């Protein structure tokens, strides 16, 4: 029912004559600005900023309380704005039914990021279910994208900002914002909604496969058109940049801004300290993170090396009941693989505890295929762990690469390759281990929080100048 209504609404909007549509959108946009003007004036007065210079930036991040790498990007971006642009108030659009105090407390506990709460406004969205995959059982990509357009309109209806930045990958919101407000639009893209890899992966043998390929190509064109509405686009890796450039066009203002990694504290860990023969997998408990194959590869490693003292530690956050069910599924799988005495699961560990794990484990594992970046991998390397990562995406092309001609870790693709890499990493001589740990840590200088804040701030300054030039 929801799918039918959303598609019908989309067709209705497209069917309206473009001139009439623009006129209607412009009129609605003017009303939205007038409606929010008194609220903005009150905010500026409360925080003591000059109204003529004051601006609001809307961060579109419906799952802002998830506690993962994407949320670290969001909150460090907010910190960058608060640090470098004192006249700007950050507006965070969220669908999380959690108080401002609770959200900021989790930000502090999870990421060690302190924010000025007086310069943050949370706008609570009621229609977040429209971007949930569970809402769209068929045509999921299209459904979520149409849903994001409706959710994007709800966002600017509740609070019309001066600048709009999407930090979760909802490119179709750009069309809505430009249609109703025509304000500067920025984006931080973690990964493309559809990629050229996806298009290449589908073999056109059956009729169904051909239909699916036609659907994907049509959607890729829609995605490309939506992305072209952004004024400035940041990507988290060269892999993501290349895909976005091929989809959205090379003429867009596109730059790589590596995500913030809290390396300063981790680099204080004594790299010479004795470590336990433990493999650490630091990742949100979600199916795409491939925890199942981490368990299977570890089980294979033990089949091949039954006397090994190695252990596996899985540490990650959960977003709700669905993720907790996934954790329970993983525990069941670990038991089936006879790993129950060798595997430990940790859920929603506070940052100090994560640092403790990073300081005692030997190997850091990454198993997600084509991961857009891999903040956890950088944290491994900064803390002195030897990374064993997937031979794809950001970990392959940007992170675990030779440093001054010397290796910084291992790459693997299959379960057997991972098992072999675990063995190689665990059986390096003490001198070889130390050299690789030092190389890995040295390579992390490119990914510090201060580097992200500087690079994000440079792009935000362009968006701000564009807004000032329009007034």
Swiss-Prot record:
UniProt pathway: Protein modification; protein glycosylation
Lumenal topological intervals: 1-3
Stretches buried in the membrane, not crossing it: 139-159, 373-393
Main location, first listed in the record: endoplasmic reticulum
One GO-annotated biological process of the protein: dolichol-linked oligosaccharide biosynthetic process
Keyword set, alphabetical order: Endoplasmic reticulum, Glycosyltransferase, Membrane, Transferase, Transmembrane, Transmembrane helix
UniProt membrane topology term: Single-pass membrane protein
Name of the top EC class for this enzyme: transferase
E.C. number: 2.4.1.131
Segments on the Cytoplasmic side according to the record's topology features: 26-138, 160-372, 394-471
Single GO molecular function: GDP-Man:Man3GlcNAc2-PP-Dol alpha-1,2-mannosyltransferase activity
Positions of transmembrane segments: 4-25
Reactions catalysed: an alpha-D-Man-(1->3)-[alpha-D-Man-(1->6)]-beta-D-Man-(1->4)-beta-D-GlcNAc-(1->4)-alpha-D-GlcNAc-diphospho-di-trans,poly-cis-dolichol + 2 GDP-alpha-D-mannose = an alpha-D-Man-(1->2)-alpha-D-Man-(1->2)-alpha-D-Man-(1->3)-[alpha-D-Man-(1->6)]-beta-D-Man-(1->4)-beta-D-GlcNAc-(1->4)-alpha-D-GlcNAc-diphospho-di-trans,poly-cis-dolichol + 2 GDP + 2 H(+)
SUPFAM superfamilies: UDP-Glycosyltransferase/glycogen phosphorylase
Subcellular location(s) of the protein: Endoplasmic reticulum membrane
Cellular component terms per the entry's GO annotation: cytoplasmic side of endoplasmic reticulum membrane; endoplasmic reticulum; endoplasmic reticulum membrane
Matching InterPro entries: ALG11, ALG11_N, Glyco_trans_1
Family from the record: Belongs to the glycosyltransferase group 1 family. Glycosyltransferase 4 subfamily.
Function, in words: GDP-Man:Man(3)GlcNAc(2)-PP-Dol alpha-1,2-mannosyltransferase that operates in the biosynthetic pathway of dolichol-linked oligosaccharides, the glycan precursors employed in protein asparagine (N)-glycosylation. The assembly of dolichol-linked oligosaccharides begins on the cytosolic side of the endoplasmic reticulum membrane and finishes in its lumen. The sequential addition of sugars to dolichol pyrophosphate produces dolichol-linked oligosaccharides containing fourteen sugars, including two GlcNAcs, nine mannoses and three glucoses.
Protein name according to UniProt: GDP-Man:Man(3)GlcNAc(2)-PP-Dol alpha-1,2-mannosyltransferase
Native source species: Schizosaccharomyces pombe (strain 972 / ATCC 24843) (Fission yeast)
Source taxonomy: Eukaryota, Fungi, Dikarya, Ascomycota, Taphrinomycotina
The encoding gene: alg11
